[in-house]
Amino acid sequence: MKKVLALIVAATMGLSSVAFAAETTAAATAAPAATSTTAAPAVEKAAPAKATHHKKHKATKQTTEQKAQAAKKAVKKAPAQKAQAAKKAVKKAPVQKAQAAKKHVKKAPAQKAQAAKKHHKTAKKSATAPAA
């Protein structure tokens, strides 16, 4: 009953598990003075509690390392996608503009030349008609 109460108080106050383990071992050493048969199991139970504490501590380290790796992966992926999209957009736009400019330049002079030829032909015909 006292151990449960001590556990609740330690949890609410935020004491570290190391301090709590020290309290349980102190209580275990006081118990052998009272009875020797119940003291032996209490001492055996105190040692595994410390071992589990170390395992939990290692687990928390792994989670922080995993978070760091996930953050690195996310940072690497985003800029690569942006760079690819920028390259594609820059390459496509100038090619289309150049093609459109070529088409307009070629069509306009061809029409002007044909119109000029027609005018010259009609002018020549009219000039030769009065002479004949």
Swiss-Prot record:
Region (Disordered): 30-132
Alphabetized Pfam families for the sequence: Asr (PF06392)
Propeptide: 22-69
Any one GO CC term of the record: periplasmic space
Biased composition (Basic residues): 51-60, 100-124
Intracellular or extracellular location(s): Periplasm
Residues of the signal peptide: 1-21
Primary location group: periplasm
Entry comment on modification after translation: Proteolytic processing gives rise to the active protein.
Key words, A-Z: Periplasm, Signal
InterPro entries: Acid_shock
UniProt superkingdom: Bacteria
Record field: compositional bias (Low complexity): 30-50, 61-99
Family as reported in the entry's similarity comment: Belongs to the Asr family.
Protein function: Required for growth and/or survival at acidic conditions.
Protein's name according to its UniProt entry: Acid shock protein
Record lineage: Bacteria, Pseudomonadati, Pseudomonadota, Gammaproteobacteria, Enterobacterales
Gene: asr
